[in-house]
Structures are given as structure tokens and as C-alpha cells.
């Protein structure tokens, strides 16, 4: 069984292993920069680490590959019998990360 970690960023949690490429909420880092992510859980074979004092020693590092946008979401507000229509679109800004290490 390979080792992996659960990291927290942008109000969400992601399961990552070394070499994984994940899209996370936008981070304030330039492409090519190295970032460190807070860890919620580490699994290394049969060993599961979830205690806060043990997780403080663990670091998940990654490299920012690029900044991109997610799919377009269309919002349409409508009120009956008044002629009120409001259309809006949104594309969430994302950061593509490559996990380089779990130590």
C-alpha cells in the first residue's frame, strides 16, 4: 500500500500522494514556486497518523504548475409574473499543484 496524505487548502480536503497533480482553490504563488500544505491525516502503509503533535512534524510540499479557471457556471435568477430575469456566469480560479514530497 502506498503512502498518502489528506491536506487542507481553500476550505477543502484533498487526498494526495507523491507525484499527484491536483487542482486546488487559487493560491497566491507564482508558477514554479514551492508551497507547503497543512496536513490533516497521513497514511504510510498500515500506519495512520492523525494526532496533532505528530502531524506538526509532517510536511507536504508541492510545486505550482499553473493558474487556470474551472468550468463556467451559469446562474439564472427569475421572478414569476414580474418580468425579472438576471443572468450571470462565474469561473472559479484554480491552481494546479504537483505534489513533490510527504516528509
From Swiss-Prot:
Repressor is among the record's keywords: no
Any one Gene Ontology BP term: translation
Gene Ontology CC entries for this record: cytoplasm; ribonucleoprotein complex; ribosome
GO MF terms, alphabetically ordered: rRNA binding; structural constituent of ribosome
PROSITE patterns: RIBOSOMAL_L21
UniProt entry tagged with the keyword Ribonucleoprotein: yes
Pfam family for this entry, one: Ribosomal_L21p
UniProt keywords, alphabetically: Ribonucleoprotein, Ribosomal protein, RNA-binding, rRNA-binding
InterPro entries, alphabetized: bL21-like, bL21-like_sf, Ribosomal_bL21, Ribosomal_bL21_CS
Function: This protein binds to 23S rRNA in the presence of protein L20.
Family under the similarity heading: Belongs to the bacterial ribosomal protein bL21 family.
Assembly notes: Part of the 50S ribosomal subunit. Contacts protein L20.
Protein name in UniProt: Large ribosomal subunit protein bL21
Organism for this UniProt entry: Mycobacterium sp. (strain KMS)
Source lineage: Bacteria, Bacillati, Actinomycetota, Actinomycetes, Mycobacteriales
Gene encoding the protein: rplU
